[in-house]
């Protein structure tokens, strides 16, 4: 089921062509919303009748407040939820985990009201289940908003050795992870708790490690993922553009750069730790220079163009989960 849906997604990707060393390389780009976290005030209900189980247990008394904390055990009895840590996992009819929901451990400072959050991957929810989950969000949450949105782009059939050379030049932490062959498999930019963390990873290798079946005819498969939290989740369009402005590779440096500039960019790319040995002005100079390189980079420009083509559809998907609440699409 999962493989079938994935294959359908890949065949609907944006077809692109990269020209490098006088060769035209066909590849595909596919943008998606990979994960969503919604936070909102928890609604309270009251019913005019008492709810009693078949065993005679009273799970709700008429006139009392009915909240998320009371609803989840009832769902669990119906095999629609399962306790998981401080929260609950929502299950589909096959028993698959489709979402995680919890009551936040603190009250809203301004109102003193109880808040909750729900976290899910929209790509893993079948169409007929989306309605149920949206109904659940509408039923339980008041004034919902995004606290996290992961925007991802699958880069399909572009050679590993080409894609794994790309870096972000932003002044954030960089953590690379390499495979047994010494090739890059995953790279993180930014702290996990920060408002923006970027990950570039070999999706094909990840799926093989998990022993998951791959779609046919996919030779190479990378994913560029931007994990946006708190206020940055509402500014997702702007953040994606800012990220791509800094996404570059030293493989095709412009001819107008001096030999020293080329050596510096190549060296800083090869050994990220060297950035720490530069003074502020020199860092600023070469970060600015790397962003100029990104403006001329073919893959980066394809990513920007395909994202612009996908923004409206991604916006609709996000907006759809919040029943008409417009998310921030400012591209300035």
Predicted regions: what is each one?
Residues 1-278, 293-332:
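Structured, helix-rich domain cores that form ligand/interaction pockets
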């Amino acid at each position: 089921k999962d493989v079938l849906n994935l294959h359908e997604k890949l065949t609907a990707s944006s077809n692109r062509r990269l020209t490098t060393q006088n060769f035209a390389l066909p590849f595909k780009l596919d943008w998606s919303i990979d994960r969503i976290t919604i936070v909102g005030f928890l609604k309270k209900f009251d019913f005019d009748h008492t709810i009693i189980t078949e065993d005679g247990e009273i799970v709700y008394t008429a006139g009392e407040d009915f909240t998320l904390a009371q609803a989840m055990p009832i769902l669990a009895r119906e095999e629609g939820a399962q306790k998981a840590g401080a929260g609950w996992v929502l299950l589909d009819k096959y028993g698959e985990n489709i979402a995680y929901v919890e009551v936040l451990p603190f009250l809203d400072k301004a109102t003193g009201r109880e808040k909750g959050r729900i976290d899910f991957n929209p790509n893993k929810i079948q169409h007929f289940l989306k309605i149920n989950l949206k109904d659940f969000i509408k039923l339980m949450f008041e004034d919902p908003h995004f606290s996290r949105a992961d925007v991802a782009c699958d880069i399909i059939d572009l050679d590993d050795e080409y894609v794994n050379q790309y870096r972000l030049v932003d002044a954030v932490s960089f953590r690379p992870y390499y495979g047994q062959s010494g090739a890059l498999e995953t790279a993180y930019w930014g702290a996990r708790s920060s408002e923006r963390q970027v990950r570039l990873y070999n999706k094909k290798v990840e799926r093989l490690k998990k022993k998951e079946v791959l779609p046919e005819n996919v030779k190479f498969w990378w994913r560029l993922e931007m994990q946006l939290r708190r206020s940055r989740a509402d500014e997702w369009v702007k953040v994606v553009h800012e990220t791509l402005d800094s996404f570059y590779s030293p493989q095709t440096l412009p001819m107008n750069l001096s030999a020293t500039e080329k050596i510096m960019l190549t060296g800083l790319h090869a050994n990220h730790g060297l950035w720490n040995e530069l003074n502020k002005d020199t860092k600023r100079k070469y970060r600015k220079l790397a962003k100029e390189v990104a403006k001329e980079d073919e893959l980066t420009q394809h990513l920007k163009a395909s994202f612009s083509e996908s923004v409206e559809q991604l916006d609709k998907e996000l907006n759809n989960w919040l029943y008409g609440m417009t998310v921030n699409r400012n591209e300035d």
